[in-house]
Regions:
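N-terminal Rossmann-like FAD-binding beta1-loop-alpha1 element of flavoenzymes
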Residues: 6-33, 408-413
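Short hydrophobic core segments
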Residues: 9-11, 34, 136, 149, ...
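Glycine-rich FAD pyrophosphate-binding loop
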Residues: 25-49
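Glycine-rich active-site loop/strand segments that organize a redox cofactor
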Residues: 51-99
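Feature captures the FAD/FMN-dependent oxidoreductase FAD-binding
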Residues: 80-160
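Glycine-rich loop(s) and the adjacent beta-strand/alpha-helix scaffold that form part
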Residues: 160-206
């Protein structure tokens, strides 16, 4: 542990800000942590459906691949503080973790509040000066160097400032985009803000009829301007406004981008991706022969979830009360085609306030990836979602926040003012 005696102001007590505060204090800096909300780590408390998906157990190179938003910018941050380093740190402070499907790492307690309380304890132990309900209005810059912050209570001088205010999603946790304004005021470019990892809204109303129905082992593909662009296999969920669930969230970043560019976006749902059209036709024929005395609505119970049957028949143009014995070959072909290719028109995303993460932010071209320091203002550092970085679900976003927070704090505490 070094003793820098530096004074560091950190704006925002989310994931990145909390680890930055702990890291800087460990390096001997005097840390002032400013948070506009009454509590620290509020977004941390709701991540992973309240369980806190801390990170992923995947090799660190997989993190780059799972970060469509400027993943390569994070090489140095991950090298300085990897998922292994994070877990070593947390385990050392007594947190017990577990690994679940897809390498997702959670607290063994399944309680995000345990992680939040751990950081609250560390702030106290490391004598971090915590300023709750004290939003920063702007960053003080003198002769091209960050020299402090201003709040409603006055000016606080500092040798370095770390901006960790988060994105624009989940505003009730304090993420309202304040950091974009502050960075923009001192000359930083803010790339267009849009939602990422967000449910999608459909033009068609039939998803509403299936509200609450979850599908597993299906394929959803997206096309923009008539060309297929992306595809995911896994689980999804119908809602009153459209579709959500893991594969929808993974594809939503691309859908959000294409919609913002004015491209028409269409989704295609394959209910039976493991079967070719020919094999599925044989399977349908077998089931129809088995249930030849029934109506069509009762003949597909072994092929489709009960609630899907009427929707699929309607889209295929087949009356639900049609006797199986009267089904024409062309109608059967339409049924098979519908199951392999259910079309949905994507008209938009849910509001950015509902996004799991925000795409866009402070341009990484103006930030040194080796230190997280601004290329425009000396002594100013950035970390977390305020930067133009975003990743898929699975613990990748929190690790990016932890890693950039750690690197920013090490750089700020270890350099001469």
């Amino acid at each position: 542990m070094s003793s820098t005696n530096k004074k560091i102001a950190i704006i925002g007590a989310g994931v990145a800000g909390l680890l930055a505060a702990v890291t800087a204090a460990d390096r001997g800096a005097k840390v002032m942590l400013f948070e506009k909300m009454p509590k620290v780590g509020l977004k941390m408390g709701i991540t992973g459906k309240g369980r806190c998906n801390l990170t992923n157990s995947a090799p660190i190179m997989d993190f780059i691949g799972n970060t469509p938003g400027n993943g390569k910018f994070l090489y140095s941050a991950y090298e300085a503080f990897s998922n292994i380093d994070l877990l070593e740190l947390l385990h050392g402070y007594g947190l017990v973790t577990k690994v679940e499907r897809g390498g997702r790492v959670f607290p063994a307690s399944d309680d995000a509040q345990e992680v939040r309380h751990l950081f609250m304890r560390l702030l106290k132990e490391k004598k971090v000066e915590l300023h709750l309900e004290e939003p920063v209005s702007h960053i003080v810059v003198i002769d091209g160097r960050a020299k402090g912050v201003v709040t409603k209570k006055g000016r606080y001088d500092a040798d370095a400032v770390i901006l960790t205010t988060g994105g624009a999603s989940y505003p009730r946790t304090g993420s309202t985009g304040d950091g974009y304004r502050m960075a923009g005021e001192i000359g930083h470019k803010i790339t267009t803000i849009r939602p990422a990892l967000i449910p999608l809204v459909t033009k068609e109303s039939w998803p509403k009829d299936l509200q609450g129905l979850s599908l597993k082992n299906v394929t959803l593909s997206l096309s923009a301007g008539g060309r297929r662009k992306a595809e995911e296999f896994g689980e999804m969920l119908f809602t009153h406004f459209g579709i959500t669930g893991p594969i929808v969230l993974s594809l939503s970043d691309k859908a959000s981008l294409w919609l913002s560019q004015g491209h028409p976006v269409e989704a295609t749902l394959d209910l039976k991706p493991a079967l070719t059209q020919e094999i599925l036709d044989k399977r349908v024929l077998r089931d129809l022969e088995k249930h030849h005395l029934k109506q069509m609505s009762g003949a597909l119970v072994e092929l489709l979830p009960h609630r899907m049957i009427d929707v699929v028949l309607s889209l295929a143009g087949i009356p639900r009360d049609l006797p199986v014995s009267e089904l024409k070959k062309a109608q059967r072909a339409s049924l098979v085609q519908t199951m392999k290719s259910m079309k949905l028109t994507i008209t938009g995303t849910r509001p950015i306030e509902e996004a799991i993460v925000t795409a866009g932010g402070i341009s990484v071209k103006e930030v040194n990836p080796s230190t997280m320091e601004s290329k425009k203002v000396a002594g100013l550092y950035f970390a977390g979602e305020v930067l133009d970085i975003h990743a898929f679900t699975g613990g990748y976003n929190l690790q990016a926040a932890f890693s950039t927070g750690h690197l920013a704090a090490e750089s700020a505490a270890g350099r001469d003012a």
